[in-house]
């Protein structure tokens, strides 16, 4: 039995609240149960130096956790003078995931910076960040389209992410902190609306997991991400 009482294939309650930030071109407050992440997308009329004059844009991401997003207060990374390896890994993952579904040529020589700030953490912050960031990015691109800044389609597809794991010998989806901290296997899947796999991160905490177990996790992830994509569509069309 899962601590939350959910079935193995049951995600937490998921919601998207677009347009929550007054100043950002795109924004979304995404909730996966008690994990809440504020995602904002900001348009900048510049590109990184390595892209100057190349006629294409860029999408990048930053990730951070508020000091009291966790059970005990954690120091701000700015106060420590450097980002942790975990923070750098997650923000690169978010950026890669978003770029996988963006036509950078259609964006022109502009950069969209997506900030994912964890307000409250209860497991799955990186997967929630990716899923909410797509909604914020979509809103930013529509902001540009409404001002005739772009004409060709920029977004090629949806992208969403979900965690899966082996908990007490059972494959489960969307692990909360209680499950994630004691799971036998923990994996994150990033998948597009068409079912293409962008990234898989998987770790056996104890015994190695089998091909059969991996395929069961992949099946759970694909079903759940199809549901998340449906919810994204509802959020951006509301």
Swiss-Prot record:
Keyword list, A-Z: Nucleotidyltransferase, RNA-binding, rRNA processing, Transferase, tRNA processing, tRNA-binding
Any one GO biological process: rRNA catabolic process
Matching CDD domains: RNase_PH_bact (cd11362)
InterPro entries from the UniProt entry: ExoRNase_PH_dom1, ExoRNase_PH_dom2, ExoRNase_PH_dom2_sf, PNPase/RNase_PH_dom_sf, Ribosomal_Su5_D2-typ_SF, RNase_PH, RNase_PH_bac-type, RNase_PH_CS
Name of a matching Pfam family: RNase_PH
Record-listed E.C. numbers: 2.7.7.56
MF annotations from Gene Ontology: 3'-5'-RNA exonuclease activity; tRNA binding; tRNA nucleotidyltransferase activity
Catalytic activity: tRNA(n+1) + phosphate = tRNA(n) + a ribonucleoside 5'-diphosphate
Record flagged with keyword Lyase: no
Source superkingdom: Bacteria
Protein residues bound to phosphate: 86, 124-126
First-level EC class: transferase
Entries under PANTHER family matching the protein: EXOSOME COMPLEX COMPONENT, EXOSOME COMPLEX COMPONENT RRP41
Known function: Phosphorolytic 3'-5' exoribonuclease that plays an important role in tRNA 3'-end maturation. Removes nucleotide residues following the 3'-CCA terminus of tRNAs; can also add nucleotides to the ends of RNA molecules by using nucleoside diphosphates as substrates, but this may not be physiologically important. Probably plays a role in initiation of 16S rRNA degradation (leading to ribosome degradation) during starvation.
Record text on subunit structure and interactions: Homohexameric ring arranged as a trimer of dimers.
HAMAP family given in the database record: RNase_PH
Protein family (similarity comment): Belongs to the RNase PH family.
Protein name: Ribonuclease PH
Gene this chain is encoded by: rph
